């Protein structure tokens, strides 16, 4: 294989190859490759591929490993997006509390016989959701919500495999640089943390409340933590993937570009915060409190914004305040994206960067339309799930534009 890929060393003895075969390595400042001996067939870091010959080491810069790792992380971010969307549908169909225990391996086999299904249904009947909300549920209806939660859990395990197995392979092959190894370890650790956090969230909905008539639901705080960590995992994977796959633009570091870059970062943070506030809306069913727009009922600012004491509790526990906050954050986000778009038009930017700005603007107004429609139609499941998927698409657009504007290290 080495003979096919590279000419024999005798053929390299010509005048034009003398610098390559010189006994002393070129200074590091004058070449982009690093010379060091490797085992035959082993790749070095993601920025080089080296082959060892009998008379020395020949290192050639290569982007092949970068592309492989970048595509892998792009697939990883896609699986995380699928988990977020499936989790949202599970929440909207009120299926999240149907599986009342958690086992990493044992629960991967679903019930198959009538006796197993009856036993599973009897376990569910011991918890508040059945006693208060679903006391007239049939076994057929229970199977539907059980399979919804089962699908979400199995998808989560798939996400873990998609991260961990290729990461181990790339590590063994030596395709990860030192910095990339740290990132990959952090991503894999966050995946494992996500699984534990998901069960911690579900447990909050299985506990008996102090008031026996309280509607069984998971803690909105734990739901927001579960969604937030998933979004962090998605953003980190997607950002790293884009950085590896998309060649950076060498833009002139002007004052206008610096302002645009900072504004893009702030806008992306605002989009993230708006998506996170949606977890509180879902956790408290706040989308059903006021189903009118732009006013909330008959007024712009409803009277029941500050019904809880202390006042700070209203931000996270009062459904009216939670919906109000989500509206304000959504309007602020689309306004910031609009301003960002017009700022980008004042600077000569590459075509791909302009496309990212236009895409982000289109996604923003589509998401606003979906949100208003979901509100006015009393949160139908298909539309609400599309709205949640739109938040991921909008966050993706913001990350893409940020990546296009990133500073190129000198």
Swiss-Prot record:
Binding sites annotated in the UniProt record for heme b: 326, 387
Family in the record: Belongs to the COX15/CtaA family. Type 2 subfamily.
GO terms classed as biological process: cytochrome complex assembly; heme A biosynthetic process; heme biosynthetic process
Transport as UniProt keyword: no
Lipid bilayer topology: Multi-pass membrane protein
Record field: catalytic activity: Fe(II)-heme o + 2 A + H2O = Fe(II)-heme a + 2 AH2
Protein name: Heme A synthase COX15
Enzyme Commission numbers on file: 1.17.99.9
Record's disease association: Mitochondrial complex IV deficiency, nuclear type 6: An autosomal recessive multisystem disorder with variable manifestations. Some patients present in the neonatal period with encephalomyopathic features, whereas others present later in the first year of life with developmental regression. Clinical features include microcephaly, encephalopathy, hypertrophic cardiomyopathy, persistent lactic acidosis, respiratory distress, hypotonia and seizures. Serum lactate is increased, and laboratory studies show decreased mitochondrial complex IV protein and activity levels.
Tissue-specificity statement: Predominantly found in tissues characterized by high rates of oxidative phosphorylation (OxPhos), including muscle, heart, and brain.
Example of a GO MF term: heme binding
Metabolic or biological pathway, per its Swiss-Prot or TrEMBL entry: Porphyrin-containing compound metabolism; heme A biosynthesis; heme A from heme O: step 1/1
SUPFAM superfamilies referenced in this protein's UniProt entry, alphabetically: Trypsin-like serine proteases
Record's function text: Catalyzes the second reaction in the biosynthesis of heme A, a prosthetic group of mitochondrial cytochrome c oxidase (CcO). Heme A is synthesized from heme B by two sequential enzymatic reactions catalyzed by heme O synthase (HOS) and heme A synthase (HAS). HAS catalyzes the conversion of heme O to heme A by two successive hydroxylations of the methyl group at C8, in a reaction that involves matrix ferredoxin and ferredoxin reductase.
Record-listed heme o binding positions: 152, 226
PANTHER family recorded: CYTOCHROME C OXIDASE ASSEMBLY PROTEIN COX15, CYTOCHROME C OXIDASE ASSEMBLY PROTEIN COX15 HOMOLOG
HAMAP family for the chain: HemeA_synth_type2
Gene Ontology CC terms: cytochrome complex; mitochondrial inner membrane; mitochondrion; nucleoplasm; respiratory chain complex
Membrane-crossing residue ranges in chain numbering: 68-88, 154-171, 184-204, 227-247, 269-289, 324-344, 357-377, 382-402
